[in-house]
Regions:
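N-terminal signal peptide c-region/cleavage motif recognized by signal peptidases
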Residues: 18-20
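Bacterial N-terminal signal peptides that target proteins for export
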Residues: 1-10
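Cysteine-nucleophile amide-bond enzymes
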Residues: 22-305
Length: 305
């Protein structure tokens, strides 16, 4: 299947005029670049370390985010949020996520192996992974909701937009699907996966004070890019915000901030690699840019065959 897993990072890049021309040349359905043998070896070894962290947690559901495009100019590290599940889809660990189906021209819920998820990056030389471990009272309902395909599909939107507005059901992106899945699990655990699932989830998000990431454009690229790029839209954002070049978008950092505030006892581990240099950092602060270790971080140098 020619697919490209949820390129929300594309939308972020489009939100600055200086990057618009470059972003327009990017195709969402392009296949990711195949890593070379050495990079593939690094990613597989790095994936083994991620898997070790998942196993060591003793949990069966974990929020997982990965880096994508280089968005340092926007102060964004993570672009894609998903749910890692133990013993699901006949795999020790798999990742349930939303992706945009290029063949069907609509979003789908997709189960992917952990290795495949980790390799879905545009920079295999340097990548970051964030893992959020939930307390039992928060993990159990999320697990039950995530593995139930009726619930997982109940909060799946019919139309994909990379810059979807979080408080509208007109469109949806990959991170928004995860946020609505959380809302469905935590806000209405006994509710059925009916047509009201998404409005109910968004009402709970708003009531709980969920704050999406705000991007401010220096000009008006989105007003015309939305007419040219089929996976971008303006019609779900409040007109006054569009007029002021403000776009509220669900990003992994916003989801993690919400979880940290609402799930007492949640913990976080971040991993990165720059070549064969790996840093593992525990806590809600980020690893220093460039995958540079700080006091207290664990450092591993990956071996070569």
């Amino acid at each position: 299947m020619n697919r490209r897993a949820c390129r929300l990072a594309l939308a972020a890049g489009l939100l600055t005029m200086s990057m618009a021309a470059q972003a327009l040349s990017f195709e969402i359905c392009d296949r990711p670049k195949d890593p070379g043998a050495d990079q593939r070896d690094v990613m597989l070894r790095f994936g083994a370390l991620v898997r070790e962290e998942l196993v060591a947690s003793g949990q069966d559901v974990v929020l997982i985010a990965r880096s994508g495009l280089d968005l340092r100019r926007l102060d964004v590290r993570y672009s894609h949020e998903a749910v890692a599940l133990k013993d699901n889809d006949d795999k020790p660990w798999s990742v349930r996520e939303l992706y945009y189906s290029c063949e069907d021209h609509q979003p789908r819920v997709f189960d992917e192996g952990l290795s495949g998820f980790l390799m879905g990056t545009d920079d295999p030389a340097t990548s970051y992974i964030s893992l959020v471990f939930l307390p039992p009272d928060r993990a159990a309902p999320l697990r039950a909701t995530a593995v139930d395909k009726h619930h997982a599909l109940g909060v799946l939107g019919a139309s994909y937009s990379a810059n979807a507005y979080p408080f509208s059901t007109r469109h949806q992106n990959c991170n928004q699907w995860v946020m609505e899945l959380l809302a469905d699990a935590w806000g209405a655990p006994g509710a059925g996966p009916d047509a009201g699932a998404r409005p109910r989830a968004q009402a709970w998000m708003r009531a709980q004070g969920y704050l999406p990431t705000v991007f401010t454009a220096s000009a008006h690229p989105m007003t015309w890019l939305a007419d040219l790029v089929p996976w971008l839209a303006n019609d779900d954002h409040p007109p006054d915000e569009v007029a002021h070049n403000r776009y509220n978008v669900s990003m992994p950092s916003a989801i993690e901030t919400f979880v940290q505030a609402k799930a007492a006892g949640a913990t976080r581990v971040e991993l990165c690699h720059a070549g064969r240099h790996v840093v593992i950092h525990a806590g809600w602060t980020d690893i220093a840019p460039g995958c540079v270790e700080q006091p207290g971080d664990k450092v591993i140098e990956l071996e070569r065959d």
